[in-house]
């Protein structure tokens, strides 16, 4: 039995929370994962996992062995990176993720500058408006908007964004400018499918929040489509401010209901751990964080 491989498999199961998720993460057949865990338990003469149909839970022995395995594998990885020179020169593939518009408009310019600066690093960018899992999707650094759900990740804040309401000048001239959220019932709106925002929009009212009904004249599935429709004069739409910053500066979209803006949402770079980071990852975070912060601060200007 390859004990380092067995430790790697057990850690994948523990981190992913199930054998099937570990199988997807490692790209190894489900039966192989189960067999290697069973072999390790036989070798140790101890039960490491409590299995159920969907999830697994570490036993007391499993918790202790996983903690020790994590330290051992980290030390082995450090030794390999030191021997290969990775701690002297950042190199290798770096996998990044971000929401589509935020990634295209703000992360991509940083990445192109980073690639010019570090020719030994290759980057793979995964842009998606659904939340990707850093562990399961093999992501080194993610750019995230909103409250962080996984407390085991390390986060570096690079700014805040807000949800705003906007429309094209032609629409506002034709239909008038809403003064309060109650006015929305008299307007056409562009909303997103499969979300509550297609029926109501939430605004702060005093110290609480209140839902206001909206009329969805057009329902779309992407932010880009909503922006184009708003510019074309179809109606009001509600977006995160970074999604319309270019159009707002160009004058093709105007903000309304600015006195009723929602609370700011934090934007973070997230990654696994802060100690023993591969040099390529630490180098990117140090390079990207101040540049992203400056770019995001410029959204409202």
Please provide the spans of the model-predicted regions.
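Short helix-boundary/capping micro-motifs
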Residues: 12-27
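Conserved amphipathic alpha-helical core elements
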Residues: 40-41, 253
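A short LG(V/I)-centered, amphipathic sequence patch enriched
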Residues: 41-58
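Short helix-loop hinge/linker segments at domain boundaries
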Residues: 53-56, 63, 74-97
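C-terminal effector-binding regulatory domain of bacterial HTH transcription factors
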Residues: 67, 120, 242-250, 254, ...
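Central regulatory/effector-binding core of bacterial HTH transcription factors
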Residues: 92-154, 301
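Flexible hinge/capping segments at coil-to-helix
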Residues: 152-163, 167-190
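Secondary-structure junction motif
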Residues: 188-207
């Amino acid at each position: 039995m390859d004990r380092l491989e067995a430790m790697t498999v057990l850690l994948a199961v523990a981190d992913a929370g199930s054998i099937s998720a570990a199988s997807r993460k490692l790209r190894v057949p489900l039966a192989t994962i189960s067999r290697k865990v069973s072999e390790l338990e036989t070798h140790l003469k101890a039960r490491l996992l409590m299995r159920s149909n969907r999830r697994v839970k570490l036993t007391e022995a499993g918790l202790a062995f996983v903690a020790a395995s994590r330290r051992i594998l980290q030390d082995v990885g450090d030794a390999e990176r030191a021997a290969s020179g990775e701690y002297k020169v950042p190199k290798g593939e770096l996998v990044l993720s971000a929401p589509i518009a935020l990634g295209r408009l703000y992360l991509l310019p940083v990445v192109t500058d980073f690639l010019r600066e570090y020719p030994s690093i290759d980057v793979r960018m995964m842009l998606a408006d659904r939340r990707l899992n850093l562990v399961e999707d093999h992501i080194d650094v993610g750019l995230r908007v909103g409250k962080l759900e996984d407390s085991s990740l390390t986060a570096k804040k690079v700014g805040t964004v807000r949800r705003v309401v906007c429309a094209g000048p032609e629409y506002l001239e034709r239909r008038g400018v809403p003064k309060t959220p109650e006015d929305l019932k008299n307007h056409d709106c562009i909303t997103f499918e499969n979300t509550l925002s297609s029926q109501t929009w939430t605004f702060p009212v005093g110290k609480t929040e209140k839902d206001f009904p909206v009329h969805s004249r057009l329902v779309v599935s992407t932010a880009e489509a909503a922006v184009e429709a708003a510019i074309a004069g179809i109606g009001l739409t509600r977006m995160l401010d970074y999604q319309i910053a270019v159009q707002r500066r160009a004058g093709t979209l105007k903000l309304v209901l600015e006195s009723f803006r929602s609370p700011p949402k934090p934007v973070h770079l997230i990654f696994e751990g802060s100690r023993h980071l591969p040099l390529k990852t630490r180098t990117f975070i140090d390079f990207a964080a101040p540049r992203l912060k400056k770019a995001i601060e410029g959204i409202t200007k």
